[in-house]
Amino acid sequence: MDSEQINVNLDIGAKAVMLARRAAAAKLNNEKLPEVPDDPIFHEKHGVFTTINTYPDNQLRGCIGFPEPYYELGEGIIKSSIYAATDDPRFDPMEPDELNRVTFELSILTVPQEVTVNPEERPKAITVGKDGIIAVYNGASGLLLPQVATEYRMSAEEFLEALCEKAGLWQGCWKYKKVKISKFQAIVFGEIEPNGKVEQR
């Protein structure tokens, strides 16, 4: 399923990002969690990731999500946003006063599909800027969202190498058949500035 088949317009995207921000704010301020919007897509199961970046220097502050459609989208947004704000092991939990110095970005994912070509051909099967990728091997796993390759101007091979590192696997792990590589697409919405206008990316 391509990202174009996920029926999400900018209005829905803005609601999704707002839900993520409100969920994180509620958790950090010990308040009641926000209600999920009534729009049907929020009650369909989709994979979702919340990315929190500092503003204006755009440094990662937290990123956690669910690659598989385990949860209804609304619930997944709330959970991933709270985890990104409080439970990303790479960072200390956010403080409430940080909320006005960060932006929220939401990635709504298609169902991951295994890349079944011969391992050496995997780079050709990945479209940089469109595909996100997942590696799984022997209990270790890692995921990179599509926008990572764009942001760092990676080739498909560099993207796969970065994935191996993210998964804690060895360099060139993607060349081995026993390492499962899957790809997915995402529709991405994010704030231009804290509490600001939302754009599709």
Curated annotation (Swiss-Prot):
InterPro entries the record matches: AMMECR1, AMMECR1_dom_sf, AMMECR1_domain, AMMECR1_N, AmmeMemoSam_A, Uncharacterised_MJ0810
PROSITE patterns: AMMECR1 (PS51112)
Domain of life, source organism: Archaea
Entry-linked SUPFAM superfamilies: AMMECR1-like (SSF143447)
Segments forming domain AMMECR1: 11-200
HAMAP family on file: AMMECR1 (MF_00645)
Name of protein: Protein TV1384
Natural source organism: Thermoplasma volcanium (strain ATCC 51530 / DSM 4299 / JCM 9571 / NBRC 15438 / GSS1)
